[in-house]
Amino acid sequence: MIEFDPGTAAAPAGESKGTSQRNGGDLVVETLEALGAKTVFGIPGQHALGLFDAMGRGNLHFVSSRVENNSAFAADGYSRATGEVGVLFLSTGPGALTSLAGLQEAYATGVPMVVVASQIPLEGLGARRKGMLHQLDDQKASAANVTKSQRLIQHASGIPSAIQDAWTEAISSPQGPVWLEIPQNVLLDPIMVPPVEDALAEAADNPPRVELVREAVKWLSTAERPAIIAGGGTRRGRAEKSLLSIAEKLRAPVICTPGGNGAFPWTHELSLQSWIEDRHMTDLLEDADVLIVIGSSLGEVTSNYFTFAPRGRIVQIDAEPRVLESNSPGLGIRADAGQALAALDEALVMPVDAARSWHGTAPEDLVKESLAKVKARLESQDLGKELKFMSDIRDAVPADMQTFWDMTISAYWGWSCWDARQGQFHSAQGAGGLGYGFPAAIGGAVGLETLGNPGRVLAVSGDGSAMYSISELATAKQHNIPVTWLIVDDGGYGIMREYMVGAFGKATATELARPDFVKLAEAFGVPATRVAPEDVGDALKAGFAAHGPNVVVVETLLKMFAPTHLGG
């Protein structure tokens, strides 16, 4: 069982915790609780003490990370694992700024979060430099590139409505983190505002335009070679059921992006799985006469590094208007993916055995042939160790276990080859920052238990990315969080090594001195083991059967499959 910090649970009847005087911090806690929040991530700080004092009088569970960036990753993981809003408390200045890389990932991937950052007292705000601790010229401006919106709350009575509005914005598509900041004195000063009794936040409706759905149906009804790219928006919009129905009506091959991994059944006869970076898949998608793109910008990875040159028409569905037609012209439908696909599915009336032919080949046979080509290409590249390593991990992981992947060679393989089954695949593919996997997994495990569905999760990192979040071993131990952390240690930044050797013939500044990860984990009180690559499956199974956190270290040098956008 996860152990939350002492002093953050409700006091027994007749007893009090913290001070007896209500303040602005109480309004924050009360509003969050009324909105359904149960857990908060963050680190205490001087200007934020009013928040933490108030938590002592409320029911919010608090998970304290060791670095604010990891707190942001944890709140992100909490949201991805549960579908709920992640909540993050930050202190002023350095604390707030340290969170920004984590927030960039949430913003890029569309993860709903409410961020409450403290501020210096009101009297210090503005153009004057009063020399207050942690003072920034404009703190919320620093968050502008990584959050949907930013707001300064200047009086206590405005706190409940501001948080309610932020929650609504966070869950409205396109989803993402919303930034609020509250000055120290507004959090600490006594208030006359009564306790918050209720709060309601509902996502704004984001349906597709009727005429655009009608036009898309017209295109698809006459298409001979329809195909579908399912991006991350498919999962965020919970559109999996509609996607399956549409694909089967059209007999359209479906490929998932890294963010869309799991949106379509891996073993379905129309599934091209997630081999989005393979040239055989790029060729197939280019040959589609109508291509449906859901929740994807057709960006760098999805377009096979901008080599994708579609010859047919594109129907692009996305809640973010800036994404539509940003890389390829088409029929742009600005809408939530769930609502758009439901409308398209309802309007698309076609027999299940609708005639479809890709130049004389049935779509189902084309899928088999394409996957066979991918398999043959991989088998021609001396990648037996890598293929077995990923297969052994997949075999060891229970079908319903959620996994969190850092930016590491194993994750890049996972983007293409990981069958999520009944679990979920989460990675830092949005912004691509290092250090995501372990703290996000911590947040995910906390979320599952908090919502009454406890379960172990897996984090996967390289030795380079592991050092970004190594301090969170203390967090995992303190809260007894059921996370198994697989660290694949190749002695450096493995993917950078490959990139540099490929581009320049040699690698520079990619080799790393690193600790003995087993001894380091044990120093935190976390059980750890080091195994050979061929034993990774058994080691993971043992870790999954244990209680609390544990670490599995594998020292091995993995290679990536050859890129195909360069003609390979």
Describe the role of every protein-language-model region:
Residues Q46-H134, M281, V290, G295-G299, L324-S326, G332-R334, G338-A342, ...:
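Thiamine diphosphate
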Residues G25-V29, E33-L35, I43-G56, D365-L451:
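Active-site diphosphate/adenylate-binding microenvironment
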Residues I2-A13, Q184-E211, A355:
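Aromatic-enriched
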Residues I2-T19, Q154-S157, K218, P310-M407, ...:
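Phosphate/pyrophosphate-binding active-site segments
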Residues I2-G7, Q119-S161, G259-P363:
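Glycine-rich, acidic loop regions that bind phosphate or pyrophosphate groups
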Residues L60, R80, G232-I317, A420-L451, ...:
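Glycine-rich, anion-gripping cofactor-binding loops and their flanking helix/strand elements
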Residues I2-D5, K38-T39, R80-S91, G95-A117, ...:
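Structural signature of the thiamine diphosphate
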